[in-house]
C-alpha cells in the first residue's frame, strides 16, 4: 500500500539493537485475533511484522486463534510460547479481560508485552494502534456532511467485548448524535461480512428511510452494501467503513462504499515487533503510539488498493 509510512532506524544501529544484544537471537511472538489468510487487515499486520523481523534479525512466531471469538486458543498459544522461552509478545487481544492473567504471567516472568490494534487492561503495557474514537468520529463527520440533518442512520458495531469495538461505537454515536442525526439502530455484526449483510437486512426492514450506515469495519460495510444492493437501495444510502482494506478501497473507487477510514495496519505489525524488541533489550518506549487515521474517499482510494 502506497500510503503507509515505515519507521526504520539507521542500518548500523539495527544490527546491535535488534539481534545480539545479549548474545542470542531474540524471538518475538505476534499474536493476532485471526489468521491473515482471507483477512486483508491481519495479512497487512503480518506483513509489517515480517518486514520488521527481517530488518532487525528477529525470529518471529505468528500465531492466531482459528476464529476471533476463540479466546482460549489465544491464551493457550501464549502459554506455549512463554514455556518455549519467547523474548517478547506483541498481541492484539481477542478479549482483553480474558487474556489479562496470562499476560500478567508473561510480564512477571520477564517477557515484555505490547498491545497492537486493540488496547488491553494490563497496567503499564504500551498500546500501538489507532485512536478508534477519533477514527470513528471522522467517519461520523463524513456522514454528517453528506446527509440532511435529522436523517435516520444506523451503526454496525464490532465485538463490544473488545476496546476497539467499544471505542468505534462510542466515537460514531457521539459524532452522529451531535450533528443532529437520528440513530435508529446500533447492532453488533461482530466484524463479519455475512453478519453485516443479515443485520443490515433487518435494519432496512424496520427503517426504510435510512440514509447512512456506519460499519465499524470494512467487512461489515461490504456486507451492508450487498444487503442494500439486494434491496435496490444502494443509491439511496451511503455506507462508511473502517480499515481501508484493499477490497473496501476498490469498492470506494467503484462508487459503492462511500468512504472508509484508513488505519495503518502494516505499521501496527512493524512497530509491534520493533517495540517488543526494544523492551526485550531493556529500552523504554512510550505508553501510547498512535499509528494514525485518514479518510479515504474516491479521491484517494487508489492509494489503498
Where are these regions (language model features)?
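A residue-level marker of the well-folded mature domains of exported/periplasmic proteins
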Residues: 3-4, 17, 21-305
Amino acid at each position: 500500500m502506497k500510503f503507509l509510512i515505515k519507521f526504520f532506524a539507521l542500518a548500523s544501529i539495527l544490527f546491535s539493537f535488534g539481534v545480539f544484544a545479549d548474545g542470542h537471537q531474540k524471538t518475538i511472538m505476534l499474536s493476532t485475533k485471526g489468521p491473515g489468510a482471507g483477512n486483508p487487515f491481519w495479512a497487512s499486520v503480518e506483513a509489517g511484522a515480517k518486514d520488521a523481523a527481517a530488518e532487525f534479525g528477529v525470529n518471529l512466531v505468528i500465531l492466531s486463534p482459528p476464529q476471533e471469538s476463540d479466546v482460549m486458543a489465544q491464551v493457550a498459544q501464549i502459554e506455549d510460547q512463554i514455556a518455549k522461552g519467547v523474548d517478547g509478545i506483541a498481541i492484539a487481544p481477542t478479549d482483553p479481560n480474558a487474556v489479562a492473567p496470562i499476560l500478567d504471567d508473561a510480564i512477571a516472568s520477564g517477557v515484555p508485552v505490547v498491545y497492537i490494534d486493540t488496547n488491553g487492561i494490563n497496567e503499564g503495557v504500551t498500546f500501538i494502534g489507532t485512536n478508534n474514537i477519533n477514527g470513528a468520529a471522522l467517519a461520523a463527520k463524513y456522514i454528517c456532511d453528506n446527509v440532511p440533518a435529522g436523517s435516520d442512520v444506523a451503526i454496525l458495531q464490532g465485538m463490544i467485548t473488545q476496546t476497539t469495538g467499544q471505542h468505534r461505537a462510542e466515537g460514531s454515536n457521539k459524532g452522529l448524535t451531535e450533528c443532529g442525526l437520528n440513530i435508529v439502530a446500533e447492532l453488533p455484526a461482530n466484524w463479519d461480512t455475512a453478519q453485516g449483510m443479515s443485520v443490515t437486512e433487518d435494519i432496512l426492514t424496520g427503517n426504510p428511510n435510512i440514509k447512512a450506515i456506519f460499519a465499524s469495519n470494512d467487512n461489515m460495510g461490504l456486507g451492508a452494501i450487498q444487503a442494500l444492493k439486494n434491496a435496490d437501495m444502494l443509491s439511496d444510502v451511503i455506507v462508511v467503513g473502517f480499515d481501508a482494506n484493499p477490497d473496501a478501497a476498490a469498492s470506494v473507487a467503484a462508487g459503492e462504499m462511500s468512504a472508509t477510514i484508513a488505519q495503518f495496519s502494516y505499521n501496527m505489525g512493524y512497530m509491534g515487533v520493533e517495540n517488543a524488541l526494544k523492551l526485550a533489550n531493556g529500552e523504554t518506549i512510550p505508553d501510547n503510539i498512535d499509528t494514525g487515521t485518514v479518510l479515504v474517499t474516491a479521491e484517494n482510494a487508489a492509494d489503498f488498493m
